[in-house]
């Protein structure tokens, strides 16, 4: 919703909607590591699955790196600027980045999209949100998703 309201690129709007799908895939596949906040490797699970489904890299790569973006942004933010879930999972996901890791990430082709996606992600989370109480919307998002997939196959 925030991505769309801010006039983000079409594919980033879809990425913002689908970025946490890895939690649901992990739960559905009964993968080890699912807790009340979802799965700590949800970004990788989602990106791989979306690539397999034919989504363009402009959708799945920002998703792949949005956790790394959180770790990057935490070096400049205080912990009270993140949701409870984001603070809890930060340590599961590797904690803060070193200076070397920060510089490396800044050279990633999807750095800016991942940072933007991460910011939309935190804007969309109430400070007490948990994975288990989220109910995703299904329309009109399905129309957007179909359009992105159709454009990627032409």
Predicted segments with their positions:
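Divalent metal-dependent catalytic cores for phosphoryl transfer on phosphate-bearing substrates
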Residues: 6-120
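Charged phosphate-binding loop/patch that engages nucleotide di/tri-phosphates or the phosphate backbone
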Residues: 123-154
């Amino acid at each position: 919703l925030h991505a769309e309201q801010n006039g983000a690129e079409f594919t980033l709007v879809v990425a913002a909607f689908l970025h946490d799908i890895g939690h649901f895939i992990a739960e559905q596949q009964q993968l080890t590591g699912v807790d009340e906040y979802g799965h700590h490797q949800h970004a990788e699970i989602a990106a791989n699955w979306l690539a397999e489904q034919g989504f363009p890299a402009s959708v799945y790569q920002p998703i792949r790196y949005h956790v790394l973006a959180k770790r990057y942004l935490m070096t400049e933010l205080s912990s009270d600027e993140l949701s409870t879930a984001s603070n809890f999972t930060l340590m599961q996901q590797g904690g803060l980045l070193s200076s070397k890791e920060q510089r490396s990430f800044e050279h990633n082709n999807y750095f800016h999209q991942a940072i933007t996606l991460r910011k939309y992600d935190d804007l969309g989370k109430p400070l007490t949100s948990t994975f288990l109480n989220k109910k995703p919307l299904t329309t009109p998002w399905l129309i957007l998703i179909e359009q992105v997939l159709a454009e990627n196959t032409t």
